[in-house]
C-alpha cells in the first residue's frame, strides 16, 4: 500500500468525522494543518515551489509502504496523501475508494488494481489529475 494512501486516507476520513461533529470550517482548518505538516519535518524542502516534474518524483517516492514508518521523518505523506485521497474520492466516489482499499488483500500489484478500478494507470493519473489539483491547493491554501 502506498504511504500517501495510508496516511492521506486516514486524514481524509478523520477530517470528515471532525467536520460532521464540529462543522465544515474544522475540515478546512484540519486540511491546512495536514498540508503544512511537512514543515515540521526535516527535509528543508518547500512543496509550494515544486514544479510538475518535482511533484511527480515526490509522489512516486511516497509509493512505498515504509514498513510501518510511513514518512514520519519528512512528513510528506500527510498533506500530499490527503489531497490525493480527496481527488480519488471526488473522481471515483466512496465505493471505488473502498474497492481500492479492499484490493490490498489480493495477491496483486496495487498499481494494477488502481488501473482496474479507476480505468487509468497511476502515473497518468498523477500527471492528469493529482498533480494539477495538488499544485492548485498548495497555492490556494497557505
Regions found by a protein language model. Give the residues of each.
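Loop/turn elements at helix/coil->beta-strand transitions in domains of secreted/extracellular proteins
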Residues: 93-96
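Acidic/His/Gly-enriched intrinsically disordered linker/tail segments
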Residues: 1-81, 91, 101-142
Amino acid at each position: 500500500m502506498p504511504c500517501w494512501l495510508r496516511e492521506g486516507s486516514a486524514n481524509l476520513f478523520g477530517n470528515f468525522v471532525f467536520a460532521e461533529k464540529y462543522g465544515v470550517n474544522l475540515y478546512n482548518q484540519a486540511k491546512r494543518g495536514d498540508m503544512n505538516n511537512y514543515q515540521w519535518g526535516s527535509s528543508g524542502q518547500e512543496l509550494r515551489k515544486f514544479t510538475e516534474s518535482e511533484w511527480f518524483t515526490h509522489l512516486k517516492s511516497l509509493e512505498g509502504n515504509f514498513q510501518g514508518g510511513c514518512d514520519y521523518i519528512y512528513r510528506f505523506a500527510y498533506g500530499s496523501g490527503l489531497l490525493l485521497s480527496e481527488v480519488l474520492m471526488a473522481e471515483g466516489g466512496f465505493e471505488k475508494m473502498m474497492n481500492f482499499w479492499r484490493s490490498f488483500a489480493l495477491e496483486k500489484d496495487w498499481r494494477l488494481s488502481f488501473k482496474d478500478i479507476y480505468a487509468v494507470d497511476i502515473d497518468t493519473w498523477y500527471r492528469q489529475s493529482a498533480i494539477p489539483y495538488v499544485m492548485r491547493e498548495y497555492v490556494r491554501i497557505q
